[in-house]
Each structure stands twice: as C-alpha cells, then as structure tokens.
Regions:
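Disordered, charged N-terminal biogenesis/targeting segments of membrane/secreted proteins
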Residues: 1-30
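Single-pass transmembrane signal-anchor helices and their membrane-water interface zones
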Residues: 10, 35-61
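Short, flexible helical or helix-coil boundary motifs
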Residues: 17, 135, 139, 306-309
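Preferential activation on post-signal-peptide N-terminal prodomains/segments
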Residues: 55-255, 259, 278-285
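A eukaryote-biased signal for long
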Residues: 95, 122, 126-131, 135-142, ...
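A short, surface-exposed beta-strand/turn
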Residues: 163-181, 252-279, 349-382
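Segments that shape or occlude catalytic/ligand-binding pockets
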Residues: 199-341, 345-352
C-alpha cells in the first residue's frame, strides 16, 4: 500500500485512533493507526502552538457524555497477531502510574464531520512558514480551501515538496516521487524488522529534527499481522513508523503519544512519501480534572457491560481478555477527549496460521458519578 492510499485510508477512518497511532481489522485489510479514537501523541512541535495541558480549575466543571460506537461485523477496531502479551504498541502508560485524576478536553476542531476547523488562517500561515523554514523551502502565497467563510486548509509547494496545513493543526509534507533514504536503511510497510525500523526512525528523527523539535524522540514500532485471502499466502507484518516527544512527565507523555506525534510513510519503492505531524490538542479546551477508576474497577465495569465498542460481539468471558491499557480517544469527530481503559478481548473469529483477532472495548476511566449516560451494552443487546 503506497502512502497516498495509506493516507486516504486514514482520512476515511479518522481518526484514528488511534488512536491510535490504532489499527483496524476490516475485510482482512490492514488500515493505519488512527487518532483515537485513536491517533492516537504529543509533543510541543517547532511548528505547533501548544495547548495548556493542565486545567484552569481542579474541580470537574460538567457531566460527561459518552459517545456511541457503530458496530459493524465488516469493519471494527481490533489487533491481529499471535501473542498479544508480547505486543508493544508504544503506549507509555503502565499500571504503576499513580493517577487519581486526569484532564478532560473539549475538542474545538470538529464540531461536526467534515473539513477540520479550529485555527485561524493567520495561525495556519504561521505553521506553514515555520515548517517551510525548517525544511529549507521558499514558498509563495499558499492555496486555500474554505468551508463556508472560514479557511480550513493551506497548501504550498516548492521543488517537489508540498506542505499542507489543516485548521486542526495537522501538518503534512508530501514528497513528489518519494524521497530516497541512504542505501543502508530498509524502509517498507511490511518487510522491515524491528531493528531496521528503529534504524530508520533514528535517521528520520535526526534529519527532521528542526521540523519536529522533539527534546526526547521516542519510537513507536507497532503494527499487526495481516493475512491475504489469496491462495497460498502467508501472514505479513504491517508496521507503522511513529515518533513522539517523551521529554515530559507521565501525563504529558501519554497525551503526546495520543495527540501529537509524527508519522512517516514509505512508498512501494521504500522512499519517504509522506510525513504527517498530528496536533490533536491544538484547538482543545481543558475543562477540568476528573477522578478516575482503577484498572480493577474497570475490569468490573467491563464484565457488567459498561463499555463502548465497534466490535459486533459482547464480552461474555473475562478469561478472553488479553490486554488492558489507559488511553485517550482522539478521533476528530470526538466531541470530548477523555480517558478510557481499552481492553483487547480475543474474538471467536477463525484465523489461519495461528493468528487471533482481539477486539477493542472501551470502559470510561472517569468515575461514574461524572458520567451522564454510562453505557450498558448488555442492557441494550439486540
């Protein structure tokens, strides 16, 4: 899958989640990390206007509404692999982190589906000029895309490189014909080892350090297995190449991993086709610190059916839970960015070659007293 198709797939699902970087299982086709949703990370970029990650007030200011998720057997959030216990998706959270409260944000970028909104044209122009300077480009007046009376996208090109800035803070750098890496680097979607991928990311982090300005670049070498329907095919591991800034405290690292990160896309010839920099909190409003539940309490909520999911199966056997992690969902269409415990549960779907599909189930991490509509899947079955 080349970077253009990869980008289109991401845009269609966005985001996501992963979430992300976030992986989806749809007709056995691997789609990219989506902003969670998602994509899914988190740094103060050189070209990014930061958002106050800490609330103005310690007390929660509003009851929270949990969104619904469409359930579709043909496409749902999942991870496919052999042993989920060995899968590292790069999430910096771990159970030893002693959070009692976490911030919640109102998403100012997507009041509804469609083109991103949020930043002013002037703020977008600042990002465009800073990105061009970091890349050593001289640009003329950019092309604009409008949604009603608002400019929602700026585009400028020079010498085979195109920079796109969107009103939600996302920056894309497209390389016409692909940008070749030095011969010693092996940069592919599905034929690169972890060691080779780490070497590629080390190189890219240094090459684009002026653009990213990460104090402590952290690599995400995640991916999942995919099995083609073609006769005689063998599983292939589709990976993603992601960096985020891990120079902050635990909370900042989690937010950077989820909302602000850089992702690199190879083309079919192993050249760099696209560099995308996410900034999901650029237009977010911090609405307060909310008390959260523990992992054990989240397990109880999962067992009682208090979760949201796109998976068309209920959780009926807790022994099938393979992994749990604390995440923020960051899809552009999320009205509120709040923390969840994401559980990966082995599904009854049959897979060839020993592969197992694990569906993703989200339990709100905020205490129930602050949730206006606690989900109850079993109550709504059918």
């Amino acid at each position: 899958m080349n970077a253009k198709k990869f980008s289109d797939a991401m845009g269609a699902l966005n985001r996501r989640y992963v979430e992300e970087a976030a992986l989806y299982h749809k007709n056995r086709i691997r789609l990219p990390r989506i902003m969670w949703g998602a994509v899914a990370a988190c740094v103060a970029l050189a070209v990014v206007v930061g958002v106050n990650l800490r609330p103005q007030s310690e007390a929660p200011q509003a009851m929270l509404t949990i969104p619904t998720m469409e359930q579709d057997a043909m496409g749902f959030e999942s991870w496919v692999g052999y042993d989920i216990a060995t899968w590292d998706n790069g999430n910096p959270w771990n159970v030893s982190m002693d959070f009692t409260t976490l911030p919640v944000y109102r998403n100012g970028s997507y009041p509804s589906a469609g083109m991103p909104t949020g930043l002013s044209q002037e703020a977008m122009m600042d990002r465009l000029e800073e990105a061009a300077e970091a890349l050593g480009m001289e640009i003329d007046s950019p092309e604009t895309v409008q949604e009603g009376s608002a400019v929602v996208q700026l585009t400028a090109s020079a010498e085979g490189t195109t920079i796109v800035v969107e009103a939600d803070g996302t920056i894309e750098v497209w390389f016409e014909g692909g940008l070749a890496l030095p011969e010693e680097y092996h940069f592919t979607d599905c034929d690169t080892t972890d060691t080779e991928a780490a070497q590629v990311l080390n190189y890219l982090a240094q090459r684009y350090s002026a653009l990213l300005e990460f104090d402590q670049p952290e690599q995400v070498l995640s991916g999942m297995w995919n099995l083609s329907d073609e006769e005689g095919s063998t599983p292939s591991y589709w990976r993603e190449y992601i960096l985020y800034d891990a120079a902050g405290d635990d909370l900042e690292d989690i937010l950077n991993y989820t909302y602000r990160f850089a992702q690199f896309y190879p083309d079919e010839e192993g050249k760099l086709s696209l560099l995308r920099i996410w900034d999901g909190l650029s237009c977010a409003e911090n609405i307060g610190e909310y008390p959260i539940i523990t992992v054990d309490e989240a397990f109880q909520q999962l067992e009682q059916g208090h979760y949201i999911t796109s998976v068309p199966y209920e959780v009926t056997d807790m022994e099938r839970v393979g992994k749990v992690e604390l995440v923020y969902r960051n899809a552009r269409t999320e009205e509120t960015f709040l923390p969840y415990y994401r559980f990966y549960v082995a599904l009854p779907e049959e897979q060839k070659d020993g592969l197992t599909t694990f569906g993703a189930y989200y339990v709100p991490a905020v205490q129930e007293a602050y949730i206006a509509n606690m989900p109850a899947q079993k109550d709504n079955a059918g």
